[in-house]
Amino acid sequence: MSVSQNKLCKRLRRLVGKAIDDYQMIADGDRIMVCLSGGKDSYALLDILLALQKSAPIHFEIIAVNLNQKFPNFPERVLPDYLEKLGVKYDIIEHDTYQVVMEKIPAGKTMCSLCSRLRRGILYRYAEEHGITKIALGHHKIDVIETFFLNLFFTGRLKAMPAKLLSDNKKQIVIRPLVYCDEKDIVKYAKLKAFPIIPSNLCGVQKNMQRTIIKEMLLAWEKDYPQRIEHIFAALTKTVPSHLLDTELFNFAEIEQKAIRFCEESD
């Protein structure tokens, strides 16, 4: 391994470790379900967590779980062969969500939203049935920023992608340990580790055009204005509720009362 490759590995492990610490993602005795899709991000997540597990001061279990949605031409042996060679505990859930979605969504319409909801429900149910305490997903820094702009531009909300959250059913905790990691570093890491990548377009659906627009915008910014992406990400960790317009976040009615109290204390 070259010096630059060694630095890459150390950087990613350090950033994942920092995210875990900052957001208290993993506790002693946790059973972590790493959702493995066969893409570069989930492979990197599993690989880095396994490395950190060896030196962690606490004990936690890792289970790699893949949901085989029965997409056409899905290479069913790639993940089992890789995981068995790796020696990690794993499970493959087989559920034909592809057929369900094809029956419910008219031809030409995007099926990503329904597919995602079905996938999430199946994984949440598996987690509950198997005593999983944390569900680990492979979203990285750029995913967070893209989601922020998607919500800003298309739904009118200041909302990104949380590093840690309680699921809608209040039964699962979802964590994103790669939240501080750059996608370009993960691409390099995947090549270095020679992960057996499974194509993401097996369902035959085109990429989300809105997300593609955002991704192209961010790439242009990164080229023309270095550090802009870093500044945007940093801003997501340094919100000032009193300087926004959301009355749910800040009680503007208290400003007069605070001013009166200040004047009384100053007299």
Curated annotation (Swiss-Prot):
Pfam families linked to this entry: ATP_bind_3
InterPro entries xrefs: Rossmann-like_a/b/a_fold, TilS/TtcA_N, tRNA_Cyd_32_2_STrfase, tRNA_thiolation_TtcA_Ctu1
Annotated residues for binding of [4Fe-4S] cluster: 112, 115, 203
Gene Ontology CC: one annotated term: cytoplasm
Subcellular compartments: Cytoplasm
Keyword Transferase: yes
CDD domains associated with the record: TtcA-like
Principal location class: cytoplasm
Residue numbers covered by motif PP-loop motif: 37-42
An individual GO BP term: tRNA thio-modification
EC number: 2.8.1.-
Signal peptide, first to last residue: none
Catalysed conversion reaction: cytidine(32) in tRNA + S-sulfanyl-L-cysteinyl-[cysteine desulfurase] + AH2 + ATP = 2-thiocytidine(32) in tRNA + L-cysteinyl-[cysteine desulfurase] + A + AMP + diphosphate + H(+)
Pathway(s) per entry: tRNA modification
Gene Ontology terms, MF aspect: 4 iron, 4 sulfur cluster binding; ATP binding; magnesium ion binding; sulfurtransferase activity; tRNA binding
Keywords: 4Fe-4S, ATP-binding, Cytoplasm, Iron, Iron-sulfur, Magnesium, Metal-binding, Nucleotide-binding, RNA-binding, Transferase, tRNA processing, tRNA-binding
Enzyme class per UniProt: transferase
Cofactor note: Binds 1 [4Fe-4S] cluster per subunit. The cluster is chelated by three Cys residues, the fourth Fe has a free coordination site that may bind a sulfur atom transferred from the persulfide of IscS.
HAMAP family referenced in this protein's UniProt entry, alphabetically: TtcA
NCBIfam families reported in the protein's UniProt record: PRK10696.1 (NF007972)
Record note on quaternary structure: Homodimer.
Protein name (database record): tRNA-cytidine(32) 2-sulfurtransferase
Organism: Dichelobacter nodosus (strain VCS1703A)
Gene this chain is encoded by: ttcA
